[in-house]
Amino acid sequence: MRVDGAKGRIAGDAAAIALYAIASALLLHPMLAGGIENFCVGAPESNDPQIFIWGLAWYPYAISHGLDPLFTNLVFAPHGYNLAWSTTIPAPALLMWPITARFGPLVSFNLLSLLTPTLSAYTAYGLCRHTTNAALPAIFGGFIYGFSTYQRIEADHLNLALTFIPPLLVMLFLLRLANRIGKLRCELLLFASLTIQFLISPEIFATAIIFGAIAIAAAWWIGDAEFRLRLRTPLRESTVAFALAVVALSPYIYRFIPSPFGLSPIYNPAHCSSDLFGFIFPTNASLAGTLKFARTLGRRIGFGCEPASYMGLLPVIAIWFAFNPRAKSAETFSLERYLALLLAVIVVLALGPVIHLAGVPIAPSIWLPALLFPLLNNALPARFVLYGFLTLSVTIALWLSDARRCVWTRWLVTAAAVVSILPTAVPAAKATLPFFSEHIYRDYLSINETVMILPFADNGAAMKWQAQSGFFFRVAGGYFSVIPHDYNAWPIVPALLDDDPYVPGYADQFKAFLAAHDVSAVIVPETEYARYAKLCATLRTAAQHVGGVVFLRVNPATLAPFDSATAAAMDTRYNLDRFAVLIRATREFLGHGNSLRDLNPFSAERLGLLDASVAGDPTRAQTSGYPFIDTVRRSRAFQSIAEYLISHRMIRERLAIELGPHMVGDATSTSGIWIGPWTTNAIAIGVLAGPEAAATLRARFGPRADAIYYPYPLPYSTSRMSADDPQMMLMIFKVTMLPALDESPRPLN
């Protein structure tokens, strides 16, 4: 359907907006049915929305109170958090300020979630309309982008779901290429778009630049000399706009440096990449994935982190179109083949640094060198499919507008392809508790009082409730990209993160943490209290059931014995306890006639020799799929490089363990222990420990050890001791030495 004139364009735009709005309402109908003021998009599957709800409240609050918007001590109190390393969406927060002020941040979040698919689809529609000059094909193209598998998977991540800028960037470039807008207007619009995109998601800002550069390079390669000459003008002006955006954003960008995470990424990109099968087989994010065969297949295969790559039958059209393009063979530039090439590049990069098939790593991929570049290595390849769906949206619009083909073929094939990717509804659940929504907390708390809300971090919703209170209280905890070092150094924090706080000495560990962070109250939702009742009972205070929560006022006398406790001292106590438990478990494991080669945390747990809180869960290999690591790990040159990175704290402990010369196998766990064979007659026992704890462990057990590593795989040396994140303290003992090791508790001075 081609429509000429202003009236036709307005009619097409109105039809597109109406269709997308209806589709958005259907996609988010669980939230609308429950009530925009009470339900939360993404709940109960995810607690991630609290980050965005908090951000929507924080930026207006910070600006109106004259606070630094990129730093807060209202979470992770009293030390605070650098918000440059968060996903708190400052641009949408400022846009929604009036609504947040009137109705609260939960309503703002839900409205943005409702608007997001429509807005993203509409900007893609505009791009497709520019490319095809046909309304109906453009409407289909916009739908494919705005209601893609990616959009459904990221629906509860507003920083990733607000994807209306990338189509605008492409359209501005094409308008300038066709000389339909002037130089200054193009530069200003590109500058504004890039700046807004950064303030929504620095990750999409970076990847949009990368894939934009790839698209331009591919066009340069395919095009003839005349086209390349035309390409220079928008390329030059885009570069100017990018430079201006970087300058304007430099105060924000400056806050990224130095990275608190070293050279290694926050999350391993190999663990959040697209699986080859993920492009073919649907997940429960698509209606096709709800079919019985798809559910069975999904359980067997598993698609890993953020499985957004399912494209249904859309790539079939792209391939068909590429091999039978509209362009005549004499023409040098085929838009269809260009788009197919671009889609292929995006798919390959979305596979990440390691290609996975049904969750099994099979080979390194071309994204591997990106791991060498800080900031860039934090981009998760599974999210690159965003640009694949944008490419497909334009491809499908072109296909539908190709009058050379049979009209029934075009529309029936496209309809089948669109049906194959139709998303399921985004879940929603009640996200309010009367204690917070009805302001009951004002009767129990003072302004700026520090509270601890359980469950902790991403297991709970502390930041959401703090935002709903208008930042009435501070929170000892929070949930952003990572837990700050000054929190993570307390042993109870990793235990709470694992949602299993009952580690050795948990009562004292909990009270010491509360004392150090000036916590005067603990709040637990009534529905979660059973899991934490034993922990809260250590406070010896009355549990008050009010407004859907259990409120516990902390008695200062209970915490008084821990007033001078430090994280280092509690870490030392904790690891002395753990090391003794591991020695005892090893001794009993071998004493029962088990083979040394079968010793690991999980075999000991199965025999009842280790509690689940000590044993932890199996760790996911950080270097899985990098075959050269296993080949060269024992070489002196490789170990020299690894030692330099580890000694300068450029990589974290889990990767450091795998870069060592010894094959770890099942000996380590998520709880931060190492227990297993070292040689045929020697065992390795280790714990994640800070420098003070490591020194104490060495003094107590070192005289009977054959070797001591800290941080592993480096030999123990006091010259490397520093107040940093816990590292693996590993000791090697001969089996014959086990009976001589003292496992009895020893009080600290």
Show the residue positions of the predicted features.
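Periplasmic/ER-lumenal interhelical loops and adjacent helix-loop junctions
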Residues: 43-62, 234, 242, 247-323, ...
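Extracytoplasmic
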Residues: 265, 415-749
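Hydrophobic alpha-helical membrane-interfacial segments at the cytosolic entry of transmembrane helices
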Residues: 13-21, 192-193, 229-253, 266-271, ...
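Start-transfer (signal-anchor) and selected internal transmembrane alpha helices
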Residues: 1-31, 236-243, 330-340, 749
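Hydrophobic/aromatic-rich transmembrane helices and adjacent perimembrane loops
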Residues: 310-313, 362-403
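Hydrophobic, aromatic-rich transmembrane alpha-helices
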Residues: 217, 244, 311-350
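Membrane-interface coil-to-helix junctions
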Residues: 23-120, 143, 148-164, 272-297, ...
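Membrane-embedded helix bundles of polyisoprenyl
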Residues: 20, 112-131, 135-222, 238-253, ...
